[in-house]
């Protein structure tokens, strides 16, 4: 579709103050001229300069069906790098759909999902990491997640990777000259310099990889299983974190028989909470199925909040739950601290990252839990304005580049020939170029834009 003029609604569906229909392509002004009539007869769409706006009517044939504003952007000074016209009509799906239909009748083609950002990428307005950041910014729920995406959109990751590429390229140029032209008087690279450059690249990539999980939590949120025995306070905890009575709470054991789901925003982290059935032996087939689902949800979760009744001694079910949390991102919450304590927390402490006394009926405990979750997931240590990796594709490329740089450094230290070092440096450069999009195949481009919606 590259080369055609495309049209789509660029705003979210549903009622609103305005809706925006975006045109992009060489015929954008021609299409706009057929569907938009300036209120000032002396103003002509074809003569509109970039970064200007005109008020007028939207028309289909001779019928005016709405009034609004047309914004004009001349190539290459637009989001896509092409001529772009953004038509702002009144919100509501009927008017916006009619405006799109009028644009299509005037010669535009329907835009594919992500088509505008794809064109921005192909026209050099955005790098690949910046293009991926557009969707991250749209999807962000918290301020830190949005800041991470905005940093990537502003080129933070591209600059960081570019610095590593420049260092390796300079190294490789010298290596290639030394290996390929032995008859020339090319000075051999100093071993200490080789180790220093390769070590610096490896360390930088290690930092990006190390922060990937926490960065992903800020961008995408995390599934959180709330598990524990009946009446330990799981549903009360869900209601505390949600800020309203999402789950039924009664003194009757086994009240929760199926998984109750609720998305909540805790600071800058979105938690997809799953309140599960109480863990105990039961003859009830329905409750037993709920307990089976509880264990399954525990295995799948990216975060576990294990709730224990602090007013009772640990039971066999408590200890089994603790053992299953070993090595997992799990926090033990010893509930009911407002009552005399009977629970020996030392019995479960070895299995958890942290053990916290709480009262799931008090707002103060919510703040304690929010801070603990941020510490455990590493999000409290993240600089939201720094370079960060987004998505499995970027992580995979960074891992390959890091491993290749490490291999080159090991080759130097083992005394292998410089040709072996050169091969590893080449592999690292290839991986970094794939990360930034300089080696972009059509299949990889499709992967980048498959998450996008129509209109972006």
Where are these regions (language model features)?
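Switch I (G2) and immediately adjacent beta-strands of P-loop GTPase domains
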Residues: 55-65, 70-74, 254-282, 300
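Short glycine-/small-residue-rich Rossmann-like dinucleotide-binding loops
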Residues: 242, 277-278, 302, 309, ...
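Generic enzyme active-site microenvironment
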Residues: 273, 307, 333
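A glycine-rich (often HGG/GG-containing) alpha/beta subdomain
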Residues: 1-147, 151, 155, 331
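C-terminal-of-GTPase-core extension/linker across diverse P-loop GTPases
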Residues: 2-13, 143-265, 282-284, 313-456
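Inter-motif core of Ras-like GTPase G domains
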Residues: 287-311
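Short, Asp-centered acidic motifs that coordinate Mg2+ and/or phosphate
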Residues: 271, 303, 331
């Amino acid at each position: 579709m590259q080369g055609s003029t495309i049209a789509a609604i660029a705003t979210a569906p549903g009622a609103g103050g305005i809706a925006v229909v975006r045109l992009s392509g060489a015929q954008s002004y021609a299409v706009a001229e057929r569907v938009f009539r300036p209120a000032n007869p002396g103003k002509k769409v074809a003569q509109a300069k970039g970064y200007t706006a005109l008020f007028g009517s939207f028309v289909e044939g001779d019928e005016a069906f709405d009034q609004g504003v047309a914004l004009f952007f001349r190539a290459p000074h637009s989001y896509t790098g092409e001529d772009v016209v953004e038509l702002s009509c009144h919100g509501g799906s009927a008017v916006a759909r009619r405006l799109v239909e009028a644009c299509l009748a005037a010669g535009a083609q329907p835009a594919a999902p992500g088509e505008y950002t794809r064109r921005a990428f192909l026209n050099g307005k955005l790098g690949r990491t910046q293009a991926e950041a557009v969707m991250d910014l749209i999807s962000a729920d918290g301020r830190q997640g949005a800041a991470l995406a905005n940093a990537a959109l502003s080129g933070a990751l591209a600059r960081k990777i570019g610095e590593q590429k420049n260092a390796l390229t300079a190294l490789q140029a010298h290596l290639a000259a030394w290996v390929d032209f032995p008859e020339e008087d090319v000075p051999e690279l100093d071993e200490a310099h080789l180790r220093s450059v390769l070590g610096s690249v490896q360390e930088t990539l290690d930092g990006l990889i190390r922060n990937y999980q926490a960065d992903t939590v800020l961008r995408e949120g995390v599934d959180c299983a709330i598990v524990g025995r009946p009446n330990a306070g799981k549903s009360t905890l869900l209601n505390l974190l949600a800020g309203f009575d999402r789950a039924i709470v009664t003194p009757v054991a086994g009240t929760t028989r199926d998984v109750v789901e609720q998305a909540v925003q805790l600071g800058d982290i979105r938690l997809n909470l799953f309140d599960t059935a109480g863990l105990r032996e039961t003859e009830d087939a329905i409750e037993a199925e709920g307990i089976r689902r509880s264990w399954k949800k525990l295995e799948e979760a990216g975060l576990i909040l294990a709730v224990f009744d602090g007013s009772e001694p640990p039971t066999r079910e408590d200890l089994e739950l603790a053992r299953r949390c070993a090595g997992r991102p799990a926090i033990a919450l010893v509930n009911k601290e407002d009552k005399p304590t009977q629970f020996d927390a030392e019995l479960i402490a070895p299995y958890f990252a942290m053990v916290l006394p709480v009262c799931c009926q008090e707002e103060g405990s919510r703040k304690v839990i929010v801070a603990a979750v941020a510490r455990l997931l590493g999000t409290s240590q993240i600089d939201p304005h720094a370079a960060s990796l987004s998505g499995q594709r970027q992580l995979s490329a960074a891992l390959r580049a890091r491993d290749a740089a490490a291999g080159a450094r090991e080759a130097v230290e083992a005394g292998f020939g410089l040709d072996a070092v050169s091969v590893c440096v080449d592999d690292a450069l290839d991986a970094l170029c794939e990360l930034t999009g300089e080696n972009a195949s059509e299949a990889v481009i499709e992967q980048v834009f498959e998450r996008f919606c129509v209109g972006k």
